[in-house]
C-alpha cells in the first residue's frame, strides 16, 4: 500500500510505501466444501479496500492506520471474526533508526 503517512511533514509530503500483512479469522468450513469465493472472503477485494483506505487521507501513525484497517474490514466483510494486521514502513528517513518500523494489532469482532 502507499500512504501519506508519518509524523514529519516531509514524510507525508513524499508519501510512503507500506507493507500490510494480514491474518484473517473466519469459519472456512463451508468454503472448504463448496470451493466458492462467496463462502469465504475475497482477498482481492480486501487488498483493494486497504489500498483505498491507505490513500484516502493522511495519517501520522501506523498505529492509527492499522486500527482503521481493522475497523473498515469488519464493516465491509461480515464473515470476518478476527483480524491481525501488521503495518510496516519500508523506508525510514531517520539516521538513528535501522530496520523497518512496524506494528501488529489484533481485534476480534466478539
Predicted feature descriptions by range:
Residues 1-110:
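N-terminal, polar/charged subdomain of small-to-medium soluble alpha/beta proteins
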Amino acid at each position: 500500500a502507499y500512504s501519506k503517512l508519518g509524523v514529519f511533514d516531509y514524510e507525508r509530503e513524499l508519501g510512503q510505501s507500506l507493507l500490510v500483512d494480514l491474518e484473517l479469522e473466519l469459519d472456512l468450513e463451508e468454503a472448504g466444501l463448496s470451493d466458492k469465493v462467496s463462502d469465504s472472503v475475497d482477498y482481492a477485494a480486501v487488498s483493494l479496500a486497504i489500498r483505498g483506505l491507505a490513500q484516502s487521507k493522511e495519517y501520522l501513525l501506523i498505529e492509527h492506520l492499522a486500527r482503521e484497517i481493522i475497523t473498515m474490514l469488519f464493516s465491509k466483510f461480515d464473515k470476518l471474526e478476527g483480524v491481525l494486521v501488521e503495518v510496516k514502513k519500508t523506508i525510514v528517513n531517520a539516521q538513528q533508526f535501522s530496520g523497518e518500523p512496524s506494528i501488529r494489532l489484533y481485534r476480534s469482532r466478539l
